[in-house]
Amino acid sequence: MNRITVDQVRDEAKNVRTLFFRWDHDVKPGQFVMVWLPGLGEIPMSLSYVGSPKGITVKAYGKVSQAMIDMEPGHEFYIRGPYGNGFQIESGRKLIIGGGSGIASLLPIADSDTDALISAKTKEELIFTDRFPESRLFIATDDGSEGFHGFPHEFLDRLDISVYRKIYVCGPEPMLYRVMQKLASMNARAEFSLERTMKCGIGICDSCSVGGLQVCRQGPVFDIEQLRNNPEFGISRTTYSGKRVYLNMK
């Protein structure tokens, strides 16, 4: 367990903040750490910046993430890891597809040969659009307040997917599922970063399992071929209490 001091914060959008800090550990793009706040709990988080300084971009969901949103320089938290496999990055032109705060996990693989499709519910919830030149940026919003009016999988019909050597995707699981189906129909090469309920991060509790695959050990990044016939991906998941719930695919 490593004690981390926040050096700098940057607000990305309402209820979204990046915490920058120093940590002398190598982290591969796509790997995650377990973030612990004493008295509140522990959650998995991917890094949005893996160089120096490192950074974690947080969206307020629960009590731990809300407490992190409220942090200022000098505040402390604890992390262990890194865990997981990370992205298999290849040279050549690539497309990253980020839904909501999921785009944060994809930032470390973006380079000058990267196009980005960034989506959110509304214009106000879009983040990191300033990281990409206009010629390489595509935007989609659920309500049409910015860019394409619709969802990422619908926008893909407008792109020539064949120009991309590989596509990398991160976001809410219903969005990942639809994008996976679309890319599979296009015979595209793609990797997906999954987020599931996670207690241990090291393969003991099995709460993060998706169709027999442990997200913490065999993921969180999976190749499209591992997911296209997975019986649970995009269908159901286990909550922190162990209850199985079905995802809203509307």
From Swiss-Prot:
Binds 1 [2Fe-2S] cluster per subunit. Binds 1 FAD per subunit. It holds the Pfam family DHODB_Fe-S_bind. [2Fe-2S] cluster binds at residues 200, 205, 208, 216. Keywords: 2Fe-2S, Electron transport, FAD, Flavoprotein, Iron, Iron-sulfur, Metal-binding, Pyrimidine biosynthesis, Transport. InterPro entries: Cyt_c3_hydrogenase_gsu, Dihydroorotate_DH_ele_sf, Dihydroorotate_DH_Fe-S-bd, Dihydroorotate_DHASE_ETsu, FAD-bd_FR_type, FNR_nucleotide-bd, PyrK_electron_transfer, Riboflavin_synthase-like_b-brl. Its cofactor is [2Fe-2S] cluster; FAD. Disulfide bonds: none annotated. One of its GO terms (molecular function) is 2 iron, 2 sulfur cluster binding. GO terms for biological process: 'de novo' UMP biosynthetic process. Pathway: Pyrimidine metabolism; UMP biosynthesis via de novo pathway; orotate from (S)-dihydroorotate (NAD(+) route): step 1/1. Residues 1-89 form the FAD-binding FR-type domain. Heterotetramer of 2 PyrK and 2 PyrD type B subunits. NCBIfam families: PRK00054.1-1 (NF000796). Responsible for channeling the electrons from the oxidation of dihydroorotate from the FMN redox center in the PyrD type B subunit to the ultimate electron acceptor NAD(+). PANTHER family: DIHYDROOROTATE DEHYDROGENASE B (NAD(+)), ELECTRON TRANSFER SUBUNIT, DIHYDROOROTATE DEHYDROGENASE B (NAD(+)), ELECTRON TRANSFER SUBUNIT-RELATED. Belongs to the PyrK family. HAMAP family: DHODB_Fe_S_bind. This is Probable dihydroorotate dehydrogenase B (NAD(+)), electron transfer subunit. The gene is pyrK.
